[in-house]
Amino acid sequence: MTQPQPAPREPKSRLLHDGRDMFWSIGPLVLACVVLAGVLGMCSFAPAGPGEGRVPNFDAPAALRADADALRIPVRVPALPEGWRANSGGREGIDGGRTDPATGQAVRAVATRVGYLAPNGMYLSLTQSNADEDALVGSINPDAYPTGSQDVAGRSWVVYEGGEDAEPVWTTRLDGAGGPAQIAITGAGGTDEYRTLAQATQSQRPLTVP
């Protein structure tokens, strides 16, 4: 006798096919949204601007000693009060920046620069160089011009201004056993910060270059 055949399965609903297709269509989009939400969750909105970040650790005394040895110019390590922090530094050249006393010709000058943060967070940079005054100031702000002077513990610093939004440049020439050095200070600090950095620098003897 012929065995009864099982009834054929009913075809899957088209809705199931559509649902599977929809899953594979929107799955990557959902995953992308989850990733984006995670990234945004690690961010924060600061309407007043970025907060205080970590100050880079820069060993100014070691860097200045290395610069004095490499550049062969008088370099001083400022004796700054507590709360001041060095955060950057480097060397640079100034083409035609000094006058050779033997020939009277303009030759290349060199400079070392260290950036400091005052206790109030304001940034100032200290540049020490064998350049002539006008060349050193011009390397910092080509539009600067002298507007007066400031007396710091009996030493005169020439003050240069360079426009409404430009930061002032204070400069003086310090003599020492290793020869003269032109010093320049500029930055976002006020007069008190300029004077503190100026006094901390001029009060020190230049490093001995072997």
Region locations from a protein language model:
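A short, solvent-exposed beta-edge/loop patch
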Residues: D143-P210
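Short, solvent-exposed recognition patches
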Residues: N57-G163
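Charge-rich, low-complexity N-terminal segments
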Residues: M1-D95
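A generic signature of intrinsically disordered, low-complexity regions enriched in glycine/proline
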Residues: M22-S25, G104, T147, G179
